[in-house]
Amino acid sequence: MPRLSEPSPYVEFDRKQWRALRMSTPLALTEEELVGLRGLGEQIDLLEVEEVYLPLARLIHLQVAARQRLFAATAEFLGEPQQNPDRPVPFVIGVAGSVAVGKSTTARVLQALLARWDHHPRVDLVTTDGFLYPNAELDRRNLMHRKGFPESYNRRALMRFVTSVKSGSDYACAPVYSHLKYDIIPGAKHVVRHPDILILEGLNVLQTGPTLMVSDLFDFGIYVDARIEDIEQWYISRFLAMRSTAFADPESHFHHYAALNDTKAVAAAREIWRSINRPNLVENILPTRPRATLVLRKDADHSINRLRLRKL
């Protein structure tokens, strides 16, 4: 069994120890499906899905069932009617981590696996990008240079959205963000209708504060972790690759980067990383890591080989 050398609220696993906890959980994901879920530059393969994500899906499945029993016990204490089994209280998962660390891929793979379980087939994934203030508002507040930092989000709207989902509303609407336009799409909405599980993915979703925060409504928190130096290199590599993908679109906000040669592209990416993404990671994102129920630690090759689970 995995052990820590001194008392701790966490238990740590290497990949071999963790994969043993899969038990008989079946792999219900094909290579073709995985290709569609894999982010640019990500190296995840079916073996990692089997050894890392299936045990995680099993753990969450068990916690969903336990959480519903807890809600039922509270309802009994209050003398309230038992909840409709077709409309359980949604189980909310937060997925946090730096830009370029692979948290979006983690969230998509987890969504695909959890939706395969008969007991919770309705799994919605929402990113916090939609809750960024529109560029016009960021300009008005002089925050364009702080885009992605906590103050650039409409945290009240995000809180209302998650509260609405968690409280069992018939539907809740999230704004939609366009990475192509680098802005909120006016009038576009992502409609969520009483899911069994909601996955909320974003840089700062585990953030705490002096008042009620969205992380206080989470049932499970995941932090995707790696060495800062490795994340920087992944960011630069992704930036270079995007010159021939997203940046190549004439409609892209970043189309002017598409024609840069390697030397200039690396310099541009490094400047963005060191002036924006690294400070945000160090000041705001990394300090939320202890809030996670599970930390997935990546090596330089993107593979997850160490995990830390909060047991208390």
From Swiss-Prot:
Binding site residues for ATP: G97, S98, V99, A100, V101, G102, K103, S104
GO biological process terms, semicolon-separated: coenzyme A biosynthetic process
InterPro entries named in the record: P-loop_NTPase, PanK, PRK/URK
GO cellular component: cytoplasm
Main location: cytoplasm
Cell compartments where the protein resides: Cytoplasm
EC id: 2.7.1.33
CDD domains: PanK (cd02025)
Reaction catalysed by this enzyme: (R)-pantothenate + ATP = (R)-4'-phosphopantothenate + ADP + H(+)
Keywords of the record: ATP-binding, Coenzyme A biosynthesis, Cytoplasm, Kinase, Nucleotide-binding, Transferase
Pathway per the UniProt entry: Cofactor biosynthesis; coenzyme A biosynthesis; CoA from (R)-pantothenate: step 1/5
Superkingdom as given in the UniProt entry: Bacteria
Molecular function as annotated in GO: ATP binding; pantothenate kinase activity
The family this protein is said to belong to: Belongs to the prokaryotic pantothenate kinase family.
Protein's name according to its UniProt entry: Pantothenate kinase
Gene: coaA
